[in-house]
Each structure stands twice: as structure tokens, then as C-alpha cells.
């Protein structure tokens, strides 16, 4: 049994069973995180009203007692109240992360027992159990190596059984229980790394930056919601916008430049994967996947996204959307972000230019960049295929963010410009992002947009394109609220559709019954003004796509919002139409 296997089952603390006081889970944060730059552990408790006020006092008090009993000195803690509960974070050395999670859980047990008037475990016995775990987890060799790496300015990747210092072509990886006494540090180094997060646009921005790296002749790679890729090789397909994808990418010995798409879930579950990035981008923040880990509002979500700044190395650049009020409000006061905007009169852009700080903006049809000393017109939006002639303003934002991040990675303007001029919305360069096809003289677009904000952005851009008739395919997974599903339909109506096909998503019911989601979508279409005969039904997305392709005629426009059957739909379009 490995050390980590033993630690995962080392202690079972019988938590009080009462719906008024629920520990929603404890987890280890392996890198910089929402609460701080150091790794640690966090627990989320669900409690309401006056009981929550008592938890705010009692839980950290019991944690302090346990830490004192364990002679755990100078441990930073963060108490974060939220609507309906409390989160408690404990910073911990890298060889006390399991112990930290158990200590938080034990402190909760003592707290809940006291508040519920129940018998608590004997403190000396509980401390003895925790000391045994701490002794078993202790790894002085790991701590010593981590200190030496930090002194040399080297980054660290950590999981349950392995530790890596440096990145990619400069990385070394060892089993945590088999560490060298005197490693050769001469070949260990970090490589340029960028992090990209946000509610929408992060995948496109990630792909753009990686393409810019390839354009200068280095082996660049990315981890994303679609795959992990090094050069032209896809290492794994799937949602890898978390620490596991980052580790898979950054441990590849061929890698010379890395771009990590970073999702909300990965940040909250395990923290950020790196601590020495040269650039971090936040594209925007909108309501999405709220209600988990105590993140209940879009303001909370903005704080999660902005925590990427804690993964920056000294001198790294934080690239932020100056047009997003949530991003602006959450921006760390300790930093001078590199702002980008579609409006040259945005006060943050005006201030940055006046102060001689780097920034990017859109003016007179061109993407403008400043390094603080020189301002250049990088490229005209009309020459950026992703912008759809300037109609897709969200992709102008993504292009500005990518260009500024690429500059932060040390890339010159020529390859940045070349990628923006050649990178297309097609299944090769940017699969699932407004991919354009021609079928029977109609323009057909495929997009994987999955929330009201992203759907509204796509449909608003396509609404500017002329069309005789407009078709939309709608479907979605069942793990959205009724309000969210209605919002998805409302966002799609920016396209002013003449026909909507509502498709069931049988593999993604996620707690709902067959027909629930299509019924909600159909009702919202009726409320927004479509007649019943303008709303068609399909039992799968691929069937719905085929129905639309059978109906389109020259001059029509169709948007297929695809959640499932992606490969089948792309194959269908390849057989019945052409790219472009």
C-alpha cells in the first residue's frame, strides 16, 4: 500500500448526523488557490442563520486547539462565510496536506458536537490519532527538495504519489517515496507558461496562444476542456482543464511552451497546478455552475477566477478584461493588470496608456497594443477570420487577450499577427467554436456554447450576417436550473430564428426525466413569439441537425448548438457540405 493510499483511509471521524450542521467535504489544495498562494486544506460547512454565526466562532477555535495540541506552529487560516455556510482553510506544508484535511474535519466534529449538545470524542485520543497521521505523512526529503527548488526559482507540480520540479523539457519527476539525496539541478528549468480562465472564451484564447508558440518554432502544448496536446499529438481527449491535465502536459519532456486552460472546478477542488506562470488571463465572468463549494454568486465566481494571479511568478503579467465589471471589481489591488478593452475610451485603458503601462484595445477597426512605450496597430479585425469581419466582438476580445499573453511569454508581434490572420473557426483550428460550413447554399455554424452568456455572444454575432431564414438547434444537459435553461433559449433568440429544433439529450438527463428539458425550451420559444409549427422536436441532437440540413436552402443561415453527438454531426456536415 502506498503512503497516499494509507493516508486516504487513515482515520474515519463519525460526523454528527444533523441537517442543520453538515460538513459538505474537506479537500486538499495542492497549489495556489482561492484562499492564498500556499497549498493547504479546506472544508465547507452548510449551516444557516444564528447557527452559522456560532460556527464562525467555534470552528476556528477548535481548529486552533488542535493545532496547538499538534505543536503545528504559524499556520495561516482563512475563514470564509457564504450564504448558507462557512469555509475554513488551513495552509499546510506539502507533507501535511492529508493531515490538514483531517485536522479541519476533526475541528468540525468538535464544533458540531458542542453546538448540538452531543458527546465529543476524547481530545487526547483524537490528538494521538492525528499525530500518527502527521508522522506517517511526514516527508523531510520532499520538503528539503521543495525548498531547494524554490531557492533556485523552480516551479513544482504535486500529486498523491509524484513530484515534479521544472516544466516540460526542463522537468524532472520522482516518486514521493523515492527521492534523490543530491539531484543534479543543472538540467532543471521552467518553461514559459500561461494560464487562461473565464466563463467563456478561454478555450479559444488557449488555442490561440498555443498556436502563437508554434509559430515561433517551439514545441508548444495545451491542456483544455477538449484535450491535452503537445505539438501535433493529442495525448488524451476529454475535459482536462484541471490539475491532472496540467500535470500530464507539463511532464512531457518535449514541451517548450505551455498554455493551461483553467476551469472553476479544478481551482476549487485542488487549487492551481503551477506557481511560476508568466501570464494569466481572465476573459470574463458570468453566471455558470454556481452553488458548489460555497460559490453561490457571480461575485464569488469572479474571486475564484481571479485567483489565477496567485500562480504568477515574480514579474508575471495578469491580463484582464476591462469591459467586464465583475473582473474589474475582483482585480487584486496589489497588482497592475494588463487591461484589454473593445473601447479605447475605457477609463482603465486611458489610465494605462497615460501611465505608460502595457494594455490592448480595439480602435478604428484595428487591434491595438501598447507595451507602455510604443503603441502599434497589430492587425485589422477584418483580417482576423475569427472575428467574422468584426461581427464576432467576443473573438476580438479573445484575440486581444491572446496577443497580450503571448507578449508576456516573450513572443514577438510578427508571429502573433500571423496566427491571428490565419487561425480559423473550423474543426481543425478551433473545433466547436462557430465552425462554418456551406450546405445547399446555406451557411451552417456549429458551436459548443453551453451557457446563456456564450450563446448570446455567438447569436448576436451571427445575427449581423444576412439570411433569408434562420434556424437554430437547441439541446442541453439536465443539470441546469429551469431558469438557466430558459436563459439558454433567450440567448439563442438574439439570432431571430424562424425555425427552432428542440432536441432531447438522452445521455445527459442528469436527474431529469425524458422530455423535461425539451418541454422547457419549447415553452420558452412560444413565450418569445414563435408559433407552434415553427418549433420542431428531435430525439437526439444528431437527428435535429439532420432535420435542419434537410430544410435549409440557398441564402439561409443555421446555428447548431451542439452538446452531444459532436463527431456524428461533424461527419454529417463533411458529407453534405464544405467548410467555409
Regions found by a protein language model. Give the residues of each.
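Preference for protein termini
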Residues: 1-192, 216-219
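ATP-dependent carboxylate-amine ligase
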Residues: 1-78, 84, 392, 404-414, ...
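Walker A (P-loop) phosphate-binding motif
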Residues: 182-227
Amino acid at each position: 500500500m502506498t503512503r497516499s493510499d494509507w493516508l486516504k483511509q487513515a482515520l474515519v471521524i463519525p460526523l454528527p448526523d444533523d441537517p442543520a450542521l453538515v460538513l459538505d467535504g474537506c479537500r486538499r489544495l495542492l497549489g495556489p488557490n482561492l484562499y492564498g498562494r500556499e497549498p493547504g486544506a479546506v472544508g465547507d460547512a452548510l449551516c444557516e442563520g444564528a447557527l452559522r454565526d456560532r460556527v464562525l466562532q467555534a470552528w476556528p477555535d477548535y481548529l486552533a486547539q488542535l493545532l496547538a495540541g499538534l505543536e503545528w506552529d504559524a499556520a495561516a487560516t482563512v475563514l470564509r462565510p457564504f450564504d448558507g455556510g462557512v469555509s475554513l482553510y488551513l495552509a499546510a506544508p506539502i507533507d501535511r496536506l492529508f493531515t490538514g484535511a483531517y485536522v479541519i474535519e476533526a475541528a468540525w466534529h468538535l464544533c458540531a458536537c458542542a453546538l448540538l449538545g452531543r458527546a465529543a470524542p476524547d481530545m487526547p485520543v483524537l490528538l494521538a490519532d492525528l499525530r500518527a497521521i502527521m508522522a506517517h505523512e511526514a516527508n523531510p526529503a520532499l520538503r528539503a527538495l521543495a525548498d531547494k527548488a524554490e531557492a533556485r526559482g523552480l516551479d513544482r507540480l504535486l500529486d498523491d504519489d509524484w513530484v515534479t520540479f521544472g516544466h516540460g523539457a526542463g522537468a524532472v519527476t520522482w516518486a514521493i517515496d523515492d527521492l534523490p539525496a543530491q539531484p543534479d539541478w543543472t538540467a532543471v528549468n521552467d518553461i514559459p507558461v500561461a494560464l487562461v480562465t473565464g466563463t467563456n472564451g478561454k478555450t479559444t484564447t488557449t488555442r490561440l496562444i498555443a498556436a502563437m508558440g508554434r509559430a515561433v518554432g517551439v514545441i508548444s502544448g495545451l491542456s483544455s476542456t477538449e484535450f491535452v496536446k503537445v505539438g501535433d499529438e493529442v495525448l488524451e481527449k476529454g475535459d482536462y482543464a484541471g490539475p491532472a491535465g496540467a500535470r500530464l502536459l507539463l511532464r512531457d519532456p518535449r514541451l517548450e511552451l505551455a498554455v493551461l486552460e483553467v476551469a472553476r472546478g479544478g481551482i476549487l477542488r485542488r487549487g492551481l497546478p503551477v506557481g511560476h506562470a508568466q501570464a494569466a488571463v481572465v476573459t470574463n465572468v458570468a453566471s455558470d455552475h454556481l452553488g458548489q463549494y460555497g460559490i453561490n454568486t457571480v461575485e464569488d465566481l469572479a474571486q475564484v477566477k481571479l485567483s489565477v494571479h496567485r500562480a504568477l511568478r515574480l514579474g508575471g503579467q495578469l491580463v484582464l478584461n476591462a469591459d467586464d465589471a465583475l473582473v474589474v471589481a475582483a482585480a487584486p489591488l496589489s497588482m497592475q493588470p494588463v487591461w484589454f478593452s473593445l473601447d479605447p475610451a475605457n477609463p482603465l485603458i486611458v489610465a494605462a496608456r497615460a501611465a505608460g503601462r502595457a494594455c490592448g484595445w480595439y480602435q478604428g477597426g484595428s487591434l491595438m497594443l501598447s507595451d507602455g512605450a510604443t503603441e502599434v496597430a497589430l492587425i485589422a479585425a477584418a483580417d482576423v477570420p475569427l472575428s467574422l469581419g468584426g461581427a464576432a466582438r467576443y473573438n476580438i476580445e479573445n484575440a486581444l487577450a491572446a496577443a497580450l499573453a503571448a507578449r508576456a511569454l516573450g513572443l514577438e508581434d510578427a508571429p502573433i499577427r500571423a496566427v491571428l490572420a490565419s487561425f480559423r473557426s473550423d474543426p481543425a483550428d478551433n473545433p466547436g467554436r462557430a465552425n462554418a460550413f456551406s450546405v445547399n447554399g446555406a451557411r451552417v455554424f456549429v458551436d459548443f456554447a453551453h451557457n446563456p452568456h456564450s450563446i448570446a455572444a455567438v447569436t448576436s454575432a451571427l445575427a449581423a450576417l444576412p439570411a433569408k431564414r434562420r434556424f437554430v438547434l437547441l439541446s442541453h444537459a439536465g443539470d441546469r436550473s429551469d431558469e438557466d435553461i430558459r436563459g439558454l433559449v433567450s440567448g439563442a433568440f438574439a439570432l431571430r430564428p424562424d425555425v427552432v429544433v428542440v432536441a432531447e439529450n438522452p445521455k445527459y438527463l442528469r436527474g431529469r426525466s425524458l422530455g423535461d428539458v425539451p418541454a422547457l425550451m419549447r415553452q420558452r420559444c412560444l413565450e418569445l413569439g414563435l408559433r407552434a409549427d415553427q418549433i420542431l422536436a428531435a430525439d437526439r441532437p444528431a437527428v435535429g441537425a439532420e432535420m435542419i440540413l434537410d430544410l435549409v436552402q440557398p441564402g439561409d443561415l443555421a446555428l447548431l448548438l451542439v452538446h452531444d453527438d459532436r463527431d456524428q454531426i461533424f461527419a454529417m456536415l463533411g458529407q453534405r457540405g464544405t467548410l467555409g
